[in-house]
């Protein structure tokens, strides 16, 4: 999915320390759109508590707040090495370490908020209302589906 236009707009409109949380909230909204489209009852992510700024209890709560379906995090209490071991076992590790610029490297704030205030986050998101729905729809309409077969 091309999320770049959404990220650029958020980057231009919102406080940089809130970028990661706001971007993740919009990623979750889009993920939920596809989950509902495919009659899925929940989202599943690979987040592990405390690994990065966006994975504190407060950050996860702020991210979850936009979802109307459950979000499962089976790796939530695992340490990084346990997650790497599992990713090697299920043949996703090599893909996970491929070098490329993504939203985590291009749009990272020097000092990301680790305890986001939901009132402030929502106030920042209000600045996005002029264009964000159209940008999200474009991203949804141009998604590329890749099927991964597990053995």
Stretches with model-predicted labels:
Residues 1:
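Phosphate-binding glycine-rich loops and their immediate beta-loop-alpha structural context
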Residues 98-151:
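The feature marks non-catalytic terminal segments
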Residues 91-99:
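A short alpha-helix-loop-beta-strand transition element characteristic
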Residues 4-8, 13-85, 89-90, 135-148:
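Active-site adenylate/phosphate-handling loop in enzymes that bind or generate adenylated species
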Residues 52-54, 80-84, 96, 105, ...:
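Short active-site-adjacent structural elements
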